């Protein structure tokens, strides 16, 4: 059994990001992978003339579900029960874990096989199973790499995106033999050989396991059908070979009808992997005679989702279909990777989803996440369900600041108080601008930049130059020249820098 590593105790984003930025190999791995995926996405999206209409349709379908979630959940429970499945309701991670562990124990198993699932990562199911003496074997290739390497996932879609091929080879050679079939000592780092080694290692686990655990990409309300979208075939093995199947699914994963599902099956593969369609789409509806699991359990997970639903601004995050398109275009994620976010949900979507599921104002790590963004809006431009991530980030920043009001003011609150005082009167602002212009003369160097400032401003100049303030502020120039109409030098002198344009 491999001990599962968790994000518990991770430092705030700025601290973790600084460490990640110093790792040039990590940055290279992330950059190469994200650029490849986003280039493929752009190509296949351009093939659809109605892609924007599909995005709007998907957003509308999700909003319809969220506005009537109680009704749809009742429909789901009825459909699943009629199909022979057992439905369980879990308010939080602890309750969901207890349900899964009890089912596994009732079948007297000491291991389960798993399909890649963000929901089970969110609730740290592997940790709960291990505590009960039950090994949880990840069967997704990237998840297997993370598990064997005693590592943490760093991407929603490609958890081992921070690893290159040579690193994967070393992990396989070192770790596979400890928990199952060993890798060939002559294993190379060619993708086909690495995949073959993983296939041989996992095959015996598939054939041996009596219980499988999965998540679901979608849950069709009208029939109670669960849908798993994947690329490797491991999901199909987990959903057909074991005798018992336990599916943990977030309550927001519902789509009303099969017609609605069609919209998402066009959007998800294009946004996630840059493919026109995904290689494997597995659907199952309860228990069927003969083939497949003869006992199906579905755990409907809340774990903070109803709290998010109550937030008029933040509830749009529940539209998320876990495609990871936002991560592949995010300049912050590209430079820091996923571990710096301290959550199974990294990147732009993680920066809003994690604080809303956990709650703000509870710990420094969670409170730092909404600030892990440049607010450039690239995430919103590619989101297949039109989540306005920048808007939600600003909304959450406001909540974080409000949660820390009172008591001894921190650096941010002190800075904002000072800014409020300065901007509260035109004379105070003019005096500050004049002082800034004089400081530019003292601190600036040739070329109009400042290379060194005292703390805490040194945090900027330690990494990059700061443009020197102009000798004459724009407000003074505007007043002196009547908006530029009375400035005979305006064609030659820049009002922003006070320097000759030539």
List the predicted regions and their residue ranges.
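The feature marks the mature, well-folded catalytic cores of soluble enzymes
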Residues: 1-313
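Intrinsic disorder at enzyme termini
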Residues: 6-37, 415-502
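Secondary-structure junction/capping motif
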Residues: 68, 99, 140, 164, ...
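Conserved structured core elements
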Residues: 70, 90, 94, 196, ...
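Generic, well-ordered alpha-helical scaffold segments in large soluble proteins
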Residues: 75, 79, 83, 99-103, ...
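Intrinsically disordered, low-complexity coil segments
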Residues: 150-153, 177-188, 360-366, 404-408, ...
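Acidic/polar loop patches that form or flank catalytic/metal-binding clefts of enzymes
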Residues: 256-258, 272-277, 328, 335, ...
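Ferredoxin-type iron-sulfur electron-transfer modules in oxidoreductases and energy-metabolism complexes
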Residues: 291-317, 332-451
């Amino acid at each position: 059994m491999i001990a599962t590593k968790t994000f518990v105790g991770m430092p705030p984003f700025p601290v973790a990001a600084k460490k990640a930025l110093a790792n040039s190999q990590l940055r290279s791995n992330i950059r190469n992978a994200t650029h490849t995926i986003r280039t493929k996405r752009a190509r296949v999206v351009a093939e659809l003339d109605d892609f924007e209409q599909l995005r709007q349709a998907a957003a509308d379908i999700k909003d319809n579900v969220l506005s009537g979630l109680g009704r749809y959940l009742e429909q789901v429970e009825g459909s699943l029960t009629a199909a022979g499945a057992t439905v369980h309701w879990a308010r939080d991670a602890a309750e969901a874990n207890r349900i899964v562990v009890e089912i596994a124990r009732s079948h007297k198993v000491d291991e389960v096989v798993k399909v890649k699932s963000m929901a089970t990562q969110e609730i740290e199911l592997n940790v709960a199973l291990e505590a009960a003496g039950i090994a949880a074997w990840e069967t997704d290739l990237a998840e297997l790499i993370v598990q064997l390497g005693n590592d943490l996932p760093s991407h929603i879609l490609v958890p081992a995106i921070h690893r290159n091929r040579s690193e994967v080879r070393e992990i396989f050679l070192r770790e596979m033999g400890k928990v199952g079939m060993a890798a060939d000592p002559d294993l190379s780092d060619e993708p086909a050989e690495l995949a073959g080694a993983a296939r041989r290692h996992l095959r015996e686990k598939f054939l041996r396991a009596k219980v499988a655990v999965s998540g679901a990409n979608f849950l069709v309300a009208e029939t109670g059908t669960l849908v798993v979208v994947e690329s490797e075939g491991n999901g199909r093995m987990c959903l057909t070979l074991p005798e018992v199947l336990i599916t943990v699914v977030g309550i927001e994963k519902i789509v009303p009808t099969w017609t609605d599902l069609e919209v998402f099956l066009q959007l998800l593969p294009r946004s996630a992997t840059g493919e026109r369609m995904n290689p494997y789409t597995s659907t199952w509806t309860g228990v069927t005679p003969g083939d497949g699991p003869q006992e199906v359990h579905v755990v409907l997970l809340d774990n903070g989702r109803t709290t998010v639903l109550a937030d008029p601004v933040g509830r749009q995050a529940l539209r998320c279909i876990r495609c990871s398109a936002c991560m592949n275009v995010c300049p912050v994620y590209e430079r820091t990777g996923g571990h710096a976010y301290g959550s199974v949900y990294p990147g732009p979507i993680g920066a809003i989803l994690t604080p809303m599921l956990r709650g703000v104002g509870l710990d420094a790590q969670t409170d730092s996440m909404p600030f892990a963004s440049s607010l450039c809006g690239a995430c919103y431009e590619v989101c297949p369900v039109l989540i306005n991530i920048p808007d939600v980030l600003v909304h959450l920043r406001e909540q974080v600041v409000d949660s820390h009001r009172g008591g001894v003011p921190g650096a941010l609150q002190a800075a904002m108080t000072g800014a409020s005082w300065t901007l509260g009167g035109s004379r105070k602002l003019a005096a500050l601008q004049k002082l800034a212009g004089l400081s530019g003369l003292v601190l600036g160097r040739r070329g109009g930049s400042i290379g060194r400032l005292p703390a805490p401003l040194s945090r900027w100049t330690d990494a990059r130059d700061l443009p020197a303030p102009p000798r004459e502020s724009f407000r003074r120039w505007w007043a002196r020249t009547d908006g530029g109409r009375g400035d005979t030098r305006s064609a030659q002198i820049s009002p922003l820098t006070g320097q000759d344009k030539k």
